Amino acid sequence: MKRLSSLLAAGALTAAVLVSPVAGAASLTPQEVAGETALSTVSDLQPTPEVESQKWFEYFKDDERVLKLEATSPSMNGRVIPLAVIPAQNPDRPTIYLLNGAGSAEQDSDWLYMSDVVDFYAEKDVNVVVPQAGAFSYYTDWLEDPNGKYLKGPQKWETFLTKELPGPLEARLNANNKRAIAGMSMSATSSLLMAQHNPGFYDAVGSYAGCAATAYPLEYEFLRLTVNRGGGSPEQMWGPMGSPYNRYNDALMNSEKLRGTKLYISSASGLAGEQDTPSYYISKGYNPLAAYAGSAQLQVEGGVIEAAVNHCTHMLKAKLDKQNIPATYN
């Protein structure tokens, strides 16, 4: 399975797109997208015991390359979201939003812990923002409030990430109006949707090892596998399969809305890679027995999932090719 090494290669393309002038650059400002929406308050992180227990914080709490911030979400009843930020060296630089995998930072499934994203972007002179929460949420606006272990209360992640956060955060970072958004696994669906729902806001979008389709029987059950782990259901999130809101959140059905945005789309084959082996997890400090058990689960269950994701990616490519919408694939 190609995991985060390929994601960082894709990140290089995203960074290159942002740093270089491109045709069809983002035209909408955060203020225009937010409209009358109440905005986040961005401040220095005051870590809770939960945050202090997370691997990313343990590894980077004293690393000056990572700015530790937090932002409130008015639409989620003032919930405080930790942010890991790799700031640009200079003002007036672009911003890349990286969305975490299914378990997010709550389960150490985040970009900082699972990759060398800090080393990679440290001298790229772009602002990189990683929201360190949102496990199993699909980073979307839910129709109903779940009451699970990870999914509890209002889930209005798209509102937070596209309307509440960018204005205050980008102002604090002295950023310009060029931005990209990228997601992996679960959030690879989310990054496509946010670009579709906010045309003209993002210059580039990365979708790594995810599934654009959501409103078809098999793909809808993929949603269930993920959100059930957080204590929610796809019906609570987007309504019944094929409902208007589910179709609105199907990136394959709405692929035309990606026209004019630079696209980087990557999937895995389902074959095991270095980061699926016991030795990789032992090197990360895991107990050897747990490492071998986890590796076996990854290679069997993960292989099936990633093979399905590969099929999803080919479906999206076929649709985009038919529409003459260019994208870079890996």
Task: Please place each PLM-identified region on the residue numbering.
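Non-catalytic cap/lid and distal C-terminal segments of serine-dependent acyl enzymes
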Residues: 2-330
